[in-house]
């Protein structure tokens, strides 16, 4: 097998989780670390003693109703109507009691006809707010306070309907369940890809109406402790090869572990023993509603498999593409060095240095030999015109400097004899 070989064999998968590696190859058992994000995307954060907690929720009541859970929403929805009916029913009963309508005296014109008990007052409040209008109970001109209460209850009923029904519709329009159909692979993988060590995970959309476009982002969260024992969290972005995707079919997100990556100096053992968490988010727009959504997940060291790659899920048919969802979580074990990406780059540099040809020193030795030769060469070269350009391969043959030097020496010897 070559250094970057592609041979692999399928690992023995558990029957409960097809494609998952067996338990004995993941990592040794160790204490589970608290994670910031759960696998379903929910935050593992609890706020205690928030300054102005209830006041901030009441001021922004609409956002509070939209963000609350559906069971709490139904309780608030029911209590808002029931309490308003009870409050105004009590007011109408007090008006009737103060005016003497409960005595059933025919000489007294009641404030509200046919209200002789608290039950009757409650039913009148219910009919007024829901605009049922049975016609049996009605307010008269005898009491202006009763007329004013009917006006206030009508206005309050419109406000309650606006907030409660509007919040329910807004909560339905958010379609948070849409984020649950965007699925992240349970494991993240580290393996060789195009000759480079890469971190990979998979994202898939399993609804018929796919997302229009989406942006993937990943951050590495590292927990550190200072000398005083206080824990700090440091975030660092992971550069992705394909961060802008159209999720028609499952896509494998790739992060190349280069010199800018926080995983650059970590080998297989260091990754298994390190204390970090990789937070991944996917922000996308649905084609049915056109609203923006966000799906989240995270990976801790025990969920990162070294030396694996994902199985192929896409099959090319004659007229269409087939996605095998059973292979979404499947992975196979492939060859990958256990050293870090930093060590791989260092080995590659050493390999290139060893294969580089040695530097030739013929020119240097030739220059030294010429310097030791007779200085007549310098005499000839100094006599040449410095403005002349250097000779090219197309010029005619000229005498070498040594021949010129020999002629010059002969001329000097002849002149000396004369």
Curated annotation (Swiss-Prot):
The modification Phosphoserine is found at residues 373, 375. GO terms for cellular component: basolateral plasma membrane; plasma membrane; voltage-gated potassium channel complex. Keywords: Cell membrane, Deafness, Disease variant, Ion channel, Ion transport, Membrane, Phosphoprotein, Potassium, Potassium transport, Transmembrane, Transmembrane helix, Transport, Voltage-gated channel. Residues 118-134 dip into the membrane without crossing it. It is found in: Membrane; Basolateral cell membrane. Changing residue 132 to R: In HKTD; when coexpressed with KCNJ10 in Xenopus oocytes, it results in decreased channel expression at the surface and reduced potassium current amplitude compared to the wild-type. GO terms for molecular function: inward rectifier potassium channel activity. A motif (Selectivity filter) lies at residues 131-136. Widely expressed, with highest levels in adult and fetal kidney (at protein level). In the kidney, expressed in the proximal and distal convoluted tubules, but not in glomeruli nor collecting ducts. Residues 1-67, 172-418 are cytoplasmic. It holds the Pfam family IRK_C. The record marks 161 as: Role in the control of polyamine-mediated channel gating and in the blocking by intracellular magnesium. It is linked to Hypokalemic tubulopathy and deafness: An autosomal recessive disease characterized by renal tubulopathy with hypokalemia, salt wasting, disturbed acid-base homeostasis, and sensorineural deafness. Inward rectifier potassium channels are characterized by a greater tendency to allow potassium to flow into the cell rather than out of it. Their voltage dependence is regulated by the concentration of extracellular potassium; as external potassium is raised, the voltage range of the channel opening shifts to more positive voltages. The inward rectification is mainly due to the blockage of outward current by internal magnesium. KCNJ16 may be involved in the regulation of fluid and pH balance. Belongs to the inward rectifier-type potassium channel (TC 1.A.2.1) family. KCNJ16 subfamily. This is Inward rectifier potassium channel 16. The lineage of its organism: Eukaryota, Metazoa, Chordata, Craniata, Vertebrata.
